[in-house]
A protein has these predicted regions:
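Short, hydrophobic secondary-structure boundary micro-motifs
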Residues: 1, 44-46, 76-78, 145-146, ...
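Alpha-helical transmembrane segments of integral membrane proteins
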Residues: 93-98, 102-126, 142, 158, ...
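Hydrophobic alpha-helical transmembrane segments of membrane transport/permease proteins
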Residues: 1-34, 45-54, 157-180
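Membrane-water interface segments at the C-terminal ends of transmembrane alpha-helices
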Residues: 132-166, 192-198
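An internal, D/E-rich "acidic patch" concept
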Residues: 23-108
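Hydrophobic alpha-helical segments of integral membrane proteins
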Residues: 11, 15, 22-40, 85, ...
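Residue-level recognition of pore/gate-forming positions within transmembrane alpha-helices
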Residues: 6, 135, 151-152, 235, ...
């Protein structure tokens, strides 16, 4: 893979030894975990070649020929580009994070507005129409929605929308004067990625708000003569937000992992394009690093949601 089809056995064996692929799977797994943890142990009997690869570190001590070092997590080197995986992911992850944040923001704002309006108006026709649209939005695959959005708004209606089928956050100037920020390239990927969470947030807001408005405390607030806006927004909506926050947090975390197809269709330079390219070239360190990064983001988002719960619902606060 790295040496081509005409590589000799000696070169292949040398590469396997350099990458540690000649070790047992258990030893490779332990070595990978050792590279990830902040305090690591490295054998320096043959020199500091391993330490030189990991970048900055602080040597805490030495036990025999084993050095104890303090460092940032080391995700290895890419097989293809010979660059650090952390650098590759560091360049791509901000674009994915921005795309996911804009998508979930669109879904949150529009979903709350539409859900509140349909719950307040609450007519049979409007409920059926909302259910029909949200069902289509939830059942539409992301890759098909991306192709459809790119074809309609980036190709057929390009003269009216001014949007391109592909493009990233920064576009290279056609006269060679460098890169410039192009936020319009964010519109189609963000709308496409926000379709499914928008449908979920809309339906959850509507059903949760209808249930909350039938509670006794809402009837009491109305009986006291409070304005309808205050009753809905202060009393009913606040208690109806718990399932919405749960859905938004889950979707935001999944957008970080599930934006692969959308990014690939729109050529958005994020984690998705990096993962697809790594899969195509069997670049396993990049794949493992991307999976690990997404898993860490899932954990962090869930922790953040638990903290937000305490502000929304005092009943779940830890005393």
């Amino acid at each position: 893979m790295m040496l081509g089809q005409r590589a000799d056995k000696e070169s292949v064996d040398a590469i396997r030894e350099e990458l540690g692929l000649n070790q047992s799977l258990g030893k490779q797994y332990v070595d990978y975990l050792n590279d990830l943890v902040p305090i690591s142990f490295y054998d320096v009997a043959d020199g500091n070649q391993k330490l030189d690869k990991i970048g900055r570190y602080a040597r805490l001590g030495t036990i025999g020929s084993t050095a104890i070092v303090l460092k940032a997590p080391y995700l290895r080197m890419s097989y293809q580009s010979k660059r650090k995986v952390s650098e590759i992911l560091g360049e791509a992850f901000p674009n994915t994070l921005l795309l996911a944040f804009v998508s979930i923001s669109i879904a949150m704002v529009l979903g709350l507005i539409i859900g509140i309006l349909t719950a307040v108006i609450n007519t049979n026709f409007l409920n059926k129409l909302t259910l029909f649209i949200t069902t289509i939005g939830m059942s539409l695959p992301s890759f098909f929605a991306a192709i459809l959005m790119a074809w309609i708004f980036g190709f057929l209606l390009e003269h009216w929308t001014g949007l391109s089928m592909t493009g990233s956050l920064y576009t290279v100037d056609e006269y060679g004067r460098g890169e410039f920020l192009s936020l319009r390239n964010l519109i189609l990927p963000a709308l496409t990625l926000g379709m499914r969470p928008l449908a979920v947030v809309t339906e959850l807001t509507r059903t949760s708000l209808l249930e909350a408005m039938s509670m006794d405390y809402v009837r009491t607030a109305r009986a006291k003569g409070l304005k309808p806006f205050r009753v809905i927004c202060i009393h009913a909506l606040r208690n109806a937000l718990n399932p919405v926050v749960t859905a938004v947090s889950g979707w935001f975390a999944s957008l970080l992992a599930g934006a692969v197809f959308v990014e690939y269709v729109f050529d958005w330079k994020g984690i998705g394009v990096v993962v697809v390219d790594a899969l195509d070239k069997y670049d396993f360190p990049v794949i493992m690093g991307a999976v690990l990064l997404i898993a860490v983001m899932l954990v962090l988002v869930n922790i953040l949601v638990d903290i937000i719960y305490g502000f929304i619902d005092p009943r779940v606060r830890i005393s």
